[in-house]
Amino acid sequence: MKKFIAIVSIIVILVILFDTCYYRLGLYIDFQPQKEVTTFIKTEDDKILLNKGDGYKEFEIKGVNMGSGIPGEWSTDFAIDKETYLRWFDQIKDLGANTIRIYTVQNDTFYNAFYEYNHENPDPLYLIHGVWVNDYVLNSHRDAYDEKFFDTLLEDSKTVVDVLHGRKKINLGRMASAGHGTYN
């Protein structure tokens, strides 16, 4: 029995250690370092080009800005449910928009609804994802080239990318005005 408890304890500790290193600290091993990075969107001069499988063609952003709040609730409560997001996405598409801009990491309900909507539609909505910038820093004696400001912005940008690719977990309050969880 002692051997069983010791083995289970070691396994639990290893799982917690892996979770902390991979999802919280963002440490991971690239098993394919030589793999070419591919993308379906790029820029040339002042044009945005999108590849839908038939080569790169010019893409015009027709977008809608979306926050995380709903009337009667605090925006940090992330009170919008999946059905509401799906309804909004339909309405946004009906407006003729093809892109949604969000200003910071949302909760998992948004990303799950966004994935579901795009997965079920041949003409998807695209996402422009922002990174929250501290207003105090912007309006104080510091500027965008201040080392501490720049380092924080760079770290938060990396965190957003890692969260969106399912490589990092964040908790409410880790980033200003951010949701929580991992999304993939």
Please annotate each region the language model reported.
Residues 26-119:
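Active-site-adjacent substrate/metal-binding segments within catalytic domains
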Residues 169:
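Ligand-binding clefts/hinges and TM-proximal coupling segments of bilobed small-molecule sensing domains
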